[in-house]
């Protein structure tokens, strides 16, 4: 979700739906970008994404800027002509009714800002064109970004490794497309109107994303808990083994240990991270979580404010005013990670407009009272007999879950700390990745101290 913007690729629209090409022209090709470091200097970047374990969706990058309809379309910002042409053909070929006879000069498209793993556009019919049936007048076009073009962190990676990463990225997109279609059919996500190798057409939902400070509002927090519990209760046709979490951390750690920076400031920052003895920390974390009871459920894996929509017109409703989006990183995983990761996101504001483009406040981590409020709402939805338990049994269940999610919050910090170090090498986005990694590791060690582990 937050790896980078990329420009369109070469391939023309394909009507073959789920046929996913792994070739270089099948995915949007990133444009070469530069990133400004803390001193204001520009450093050229090799673009690329994150490599993932086979047969599992890719990991969720933490919430730097965000996806579907976060920001309104920019009326004065148009895509490049090639992207506009391809968008027109996709809409004309995949959408019914008035779209079928639409001329290209009648086609309206505008950029939606906020997507960093993908490019997002609003495509619409002009007011002068009448609807034929119940076809949508506006749709969201998502062009896949980094996930399809995963690359090793170092240029000296073997061709075999590069091909494997590319295959894994393509495989992840197939899985995500299947997942999106299933959730759409179950009315748990936006409707799916079209799918093709380079992206998809989705329902455009009038809404806005939540702000970080809204996560702590009691009614918002309770509904997020209920939505997450419903998500966790789903049966999905994916690998049920919880390999994603530690498989991803191991892969990131191996990449971090091979990283080389040319700038002295980056070299010193990397040395500081390596001084933490990250391999030993990972093994200690693995040992701790092995003895932490946490059911394996179908997890969102990126339930932060940018992936939660507040539906337009539902702002004053008591319930059913939120929708979870961006399922591309979902997988079977430990429940404690999904909830602990959500709690960690209370601390980070990614809307700050100056370097390093985020603000961290460790004091924003939910209090015991706020955690219990979330957990109570979660258990009421997730566990059918929870409300029939005695007060003592309910209290014991909630205490166990408090320990579970706060231990797994350590994994959230560790995962995104490693991820951000890797992004400092490969991302073209202007963001303080090394500073963000430091913030996550600072929070990791603070959480360890509080837990006494």
Swiss-Prot record:
Region (Disordered) location: 22-81
EC number: 2.7.1.32, 2.7.1.82
Biological process (GO), any one: phosphatidylethanolamine biosynthetic process
Binding-site list for ATP: 113-119, 142, 203-209, 304, 326
Source taxon at top rank: Eukaryota
GO cellular component: cytoplasm; cytosol; lipid droplet
Residue ranges, compositional bias (Pro residues): 55-73
Entry keyword Nucleotide-binding: yes
Pathway field: Phospholipid metabolism; phosphatidylcholine biosynthesis; phosphocholine from choline: step 1/1; Phospholipid metabolism; phosphatidylethanolamine biosynthesis; phosphatidylethanolamine from ethanolamine: step 1/3
UniProt GO MF annotations: ATP binding; choline binding; choline kinase activity; cholinesterase activity; ethanolamine kinase activity; identical protein binding; protein homodimerization activity; protein tyrosine kinase activity
Keywords: Acetylation, ATP-binding, Cytoplasm, Kinase, Lipid biosynthesis, Lipid droplet, Lipid metabolism, Nucleotide-binding, Phospholipid biosynthesis, Phospholipid metabolism, Phosphoprotein, Transferase
Catalysed transformations (reactions): choline + ATP = phosphocholine + ADP + H(+); ethanolamine + ATP = phosphoethanolamine + ADP + H(+)
One Pfam short name: Choline_kinase
Known tissue expression: Testis, brain, lung, kidney and liver.
Phosphoserine: modified positions: 71, 275
Residues that hold phosphocholine according to the record: 115-117
Positions where N6-acetyllysine occurs in the chain: 243
Location(s), subcellular: Cytoplasm, Cytosol
Quaternary structure note: Heterodimer with CHKB. Homodimer.
Family designation: Belongs to the choline/ethanolamine kinase family.
Record's function text: Plays a key role in phospholipid biosynthesis by catalyzing the phosphorylation of free choline to phosphocholine, the first step in phosphatidylcholine biosynthesis. Also phosphorylates ethanolamine, thereby contributing to phosphatidylethanolamine biosynthesis. Has higher activity with choline.
Protein name listed in UniProt: Choline kinase alpha
Species per Swiss-Prot/TrEMBL record: Rattus norvegicus
């Amino acid at each position: 979700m937050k790896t980078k913007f990329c420009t369109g690729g070469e391939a023309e629209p394909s009507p073959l739906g789920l046929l996913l090409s792994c070739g270089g022209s099948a995915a949007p090709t990133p444009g070469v970008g530069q990133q400004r470091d803390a001193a204001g200097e520009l450093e050229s970047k090799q673009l690329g994404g994150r490599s993932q374990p086979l047969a599992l969706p890719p990991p969720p990058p933490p919430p730097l800027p965000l996806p579907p309809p976060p920001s309104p379309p920019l009326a004065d910002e148009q895509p490049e002509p090639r992207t506009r042409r391809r968008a027109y053909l996709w809409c004309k070929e995949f959408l019914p009714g008035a779209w079928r006879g639409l001329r290209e000069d009648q086609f309206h498209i505008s950029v939606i800002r906020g997507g960093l793993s993908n490019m997002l556009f609003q495509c619409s019919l002009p007011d002068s064109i009448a609807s034929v049936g119940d076809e949508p007048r506006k749709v969201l076009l998502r062009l896949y970004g980094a996930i399809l073009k995963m690359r090793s962190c170092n240029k000296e990676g073997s061709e075999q490794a590069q091909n494997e990463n590319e295959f894994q990225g393509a495989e992840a997109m197939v899985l995500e497309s299947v997942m999106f279609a299933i959730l759409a059919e179950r009315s748990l996500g936006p409707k799916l109107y079209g799918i093709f190798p380079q992206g998809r057409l989705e329902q455009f939902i009038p809404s806005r994303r939540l702000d970080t400070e809204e996560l702590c509002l009691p009614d918002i927090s309770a509904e997020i808990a209920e939505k997450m519990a419903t998500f966790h209760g789903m049966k999905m046709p994916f690998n049920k083994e919880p390999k994603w979490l530690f498989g991803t951390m191991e892969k990131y750690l191996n990449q971090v240990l091979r990283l080389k920076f040319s700038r002295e400031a980056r070299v010193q920052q990397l040395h500081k991270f390596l001084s933490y003895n990250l391999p030993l920390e990972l093994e200690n974390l693995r040992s701790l979580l092995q003895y932490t009871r946490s059911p394996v459920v179908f997890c969102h894996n990126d339930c932060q404010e940018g992936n939660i929509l507040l539906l337009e017109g539902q702002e004053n409703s008591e319930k059913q005013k939120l929708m979870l989006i961006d399922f591309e990183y979902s997988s079977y995983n430990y429940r404690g990670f999904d909830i602990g990761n959500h709690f960690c996101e209370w601390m980070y504001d990614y809307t700050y407009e100056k370097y390093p483009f985020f603000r961290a406040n460790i004091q924003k981590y939910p209090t015991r009272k706020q955690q219990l409020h979330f957990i109570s709402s979660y258990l009421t939805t997730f566990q059918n007999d929870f409300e029939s338990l005695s007060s003592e049994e309910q209290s014991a269940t909630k205490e166990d879950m408090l320990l579970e999610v706060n231990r797994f919050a350590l994994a959230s910090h560790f995962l995104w700390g490693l991820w951000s170090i890797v992004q400092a090498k490969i991302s073209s986005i202007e963001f303080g990745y090394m500073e963000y990694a430091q913030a996550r590791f600072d929070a990791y060690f603070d959480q360890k101290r509080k837990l006494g582990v």
